[in-house]
Structure formats: C-alpha cells, structure tokens
C-alpha cells in the first residue's frame, strides 16, 4: 500500500480509533466521523482560514449540553470531519516524509478535540486537557 495514499491514511485513522477511550468510540456511534481530503473553500472563507492545511478537523452540529428536546428547530445532523491533507502536513518532517507516530498523535488529538466540542467543551477547556 502506498504510504501516502488515502487508503493508507484511512488505515492509520482506524488504528487510532481502536485506541480511543470508550466514551469517544460510543459517541462515534451517534456522531459519525468523516474523513475528507481537505475542507471546502466556502468553509475556509467563512472561518477566515487562508491555507486549507491549517484546518485539521471540524465538529458541526449542536453540542449535547445545548440540545433541547422540546425545540421545534431543525438542525443538520451532528458530525465530525477530519481533513487528511492538513493532518499529513502537520506530521511532515523537514525531509518531506510523514512521521507516522506524529501523524497518529495528531489524528488522535484532532478527533478528541472535535468530540470534545460535541460534549460542549470550549477551546479553552480543550487546551487545558492538551487537545487544543
């Protein structure tokens, strides 16, 4: 398998998921994890991000602690998306090769960060736990 192919990256993501805390894996049953190569341009413009490699993940939806069961509003389904290109770039060594150990760490931190948002954690709280 080509080391930098999408198939290779997906296998790394699967390895990381297997080692995630049970609470997060249970959340994944309710809030699916998607892997995309890079974020859409429209999203980057909305977020004020110029380099698409700077966005590694995104939670979209309503955090658990903000859901109201008596609300009549319709929301898009909750989801977490991680972006392959940015994560690969974040683990790139000076010689141009991807550090697989660092890549696994970055994927783990990104997934935990985004599911932290699902549980209602702020950026500051995530930073305190090392998932900033």
Please annotate each region the language model reported:
Residues 128-132:
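Short hydrophobic/aromatic patches at helix-to-coil boundaries
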């Amino acid at each position: 398998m080509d080391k930098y192919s999408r198939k290779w990256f997906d296998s790394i993501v699967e390895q990381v998921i297997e080692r995630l805390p049970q609470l997060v894996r249970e959340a994944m049953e309710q809030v699916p994890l998607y892997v995309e190569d890079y974020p859409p341009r429209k999203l980057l413009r909305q977020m004020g991000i110029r380099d698409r490699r700077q966005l590694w993940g995104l939670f979209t939806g309503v955090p658990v602690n903000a859901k109201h069961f008596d609300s009549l509003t319709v929301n898009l389904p909750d989801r977490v998306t991680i972006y392959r290109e940015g994560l690969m770039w974040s683990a790139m060594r000076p010689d141009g090769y991807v550090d697989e150990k660092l890549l696994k760490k970055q994927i783990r931190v990104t997934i935990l960060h985004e599911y932290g948002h699902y549980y209602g954690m702020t950026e500051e709280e995530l930073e305190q736990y090392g998932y900033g």
